[in-house]
Structure formats: structure tokens, C-alpha cells
């Protein structure tokens, strides 16, 4: 397992204001709107529910969920406005403090480089677009593989996966500091990001048809969808922007 903890930012010329702002927004939403995870009414109102996205109709009632030999009830809440708003809002919410910290670490490592490539405005659009596409990938896979469509999803990892897909394309040889086999070392970006993506693929195929809860609550298809979207779209978003100083 390879765990990134930083990278070489030599050649970066822009201060990554948007990356810092996104990190701040995620923290503020978790602390003040989600009440550090205790405000279930807000969390279940704005999480993305595949059934709602498919039908366009809000599901505001307790829903019984069964995963393997375990079962429980999810108290889905009414969503103010359109249910499609959850595709955007849910990417700023998290299920736990560790969920938040892990995502923000990856955004801090990889986001600044892509923001430097695209510029502040384009990076904002790129981040939001890949996040929404990641959520849609999760929705589509839910119905394709017969997972429970009432299980809500949330988190910035889909958008951050998009950033990592862009990083693989734009910075394949940039040195990334990682913890690998309990040792601190540096590897090229294509190794760090490529191994991460390989893990997502293996994990996704292991839980297909069993729902995200069987994979520890991780929506792996959102990660895969966001990553592919980022890898495909980053050059399009970079058209017309100045080239990054170093790859």
C-alpha cells in the first residue's frame, strides 16, 4: 500500500487560493453545519441518494437498509429545493473526522499543482465538474450492479479523485513523498497515483453488487468515475492557460 504525504512543488508560481478555500469550506461545513457529524438532519438532507437522482423525487422517510446479515434504518430527510442540488452540496460533507482529514490531505497534496496548471477560475470549474461526474458515476453504477439505491453518499473524494486523474496526466514525473512498506520514500507521480487508482479498481470489483457498505462505506465507483473524468478533461480545461513550469 502506498500512502502519499506530500510532493515536490518546485516550479509552482501561483498561490493555491482555491485549494485552501476548498479545504476551509469542507472543514467549516463539517464543524458548523454537520455539527462534527452529529447533525443527521442536515447530513441526510443533502447527501446524494441515487434513487432521488434517478427519479428527481425527494425521499423524506426512514428507509430500511440490509447489507449481508446486517440491517438498519437510515432517516432520510427532506432536501430544501431540488434533489439535484445534493450532487454539489454532498461533495463538501463528510461522514467522520478521519474521512475529512484523509480527503483534505490528498486535496492539499495534489490540488495546488492542478490549480497552478489551470488557474484559479478554471480549477474551480474543474473541481466541481469532476465531483459531480463522480457522483453521477456512483449513481449509474448503483443501478447497473443492483446496489441499494437508497444508501446516501457524501464526501469530497470524487472531486479529489478528479484532481488526481488530472495530476497523473499533467505531472506524471513529479516526485511524490509516500509511505510505502512502512518506509518514507519518493516515487514519480505516475507510481503514487497509479497504484492508488489500481487499488480503487481492485476494491470496486470486490464489492460490485454488494453496495458501498460492504467496502467499508466507500463509493469506489465514484473514485473511479472522478479519476477518469479528471484525466480526460484536464487538458481541455488547460487550453489557453499558461503551461506549468515543471512536470
Model-derived regions: residue spans:
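A detector for small-residue-rich transmembrane helices and their helix-helix packing motifs
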Residues: 1-247
Amino acid at each position: 500500500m502506498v500512502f502519499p504525504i506530500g510532493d515536490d512543488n518546485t516550479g509552482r508560481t501561483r498561490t493555491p487560493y482555491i485549494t485552501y478555500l476548498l479545504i476551509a469550506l469542507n472543514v467549516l461545513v463539517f464543524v458548523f453545519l454537520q455539527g462534527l457529524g452529529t447533525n443527521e438532519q442536515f447530513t441526510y438532507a443533502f447527501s446524494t441518494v441515487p434513487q432521488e437522482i434517478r427519479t428527481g423525487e425527494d425521499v423524506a422517510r426512514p428507509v430500511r437498509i440490509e447489507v449481508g446479515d446486517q440491517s438498519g434504518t437510515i432517516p432520510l430527510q427532506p432536501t430544501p429545493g431540488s434533489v439535484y442540488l445534493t450532487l454539489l452540496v454532498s461533495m463538501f460533507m463528510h461522514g467522520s473526522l478521519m474521512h475529512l482529514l484523509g480527503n483534505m490531505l490528498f486535496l492539499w497534496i495534489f490540488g495546488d499543482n492542478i490549480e497552478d496548471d489551470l488557474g484559479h477560475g478554471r480549477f474551480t470549474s474543474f473541481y466541481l465538474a469532476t465531483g459531480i461526474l463522480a457522483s453521477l458515476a456512483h449513481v449509474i453504477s448503483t443501478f447497473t450492479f443492483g446496489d441499494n439505491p437508497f444508501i446516501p453518499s457524501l464526501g469530497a473524494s470524487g472531486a479529489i479523485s478528479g484532481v488526481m486523474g488530472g495530476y497523473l496526466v499533467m505531472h506524471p514525473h513529479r516526485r511524490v513523498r509516500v509511505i510505502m512498506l512502512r518506509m518514507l520514500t519518493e516515487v514519480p507521480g505516475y507510481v503514487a497515483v497509479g497504484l492508488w487508482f489500481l487499488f480503487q479498481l481492485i476494491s470496486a470489483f470486490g464489492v460490485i453488487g454488494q453496495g458501498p457498505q460492504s467496502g467499508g462505506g466507500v463509493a469506489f465507483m465514484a473514485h473511479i468515475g472522478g479519476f477518469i473524468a479528471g484525466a480526460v478533461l484536464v487538458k481541455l480545461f488547460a487550453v489557453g492557460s499558461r503551461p506549468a513550469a515543471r512536470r
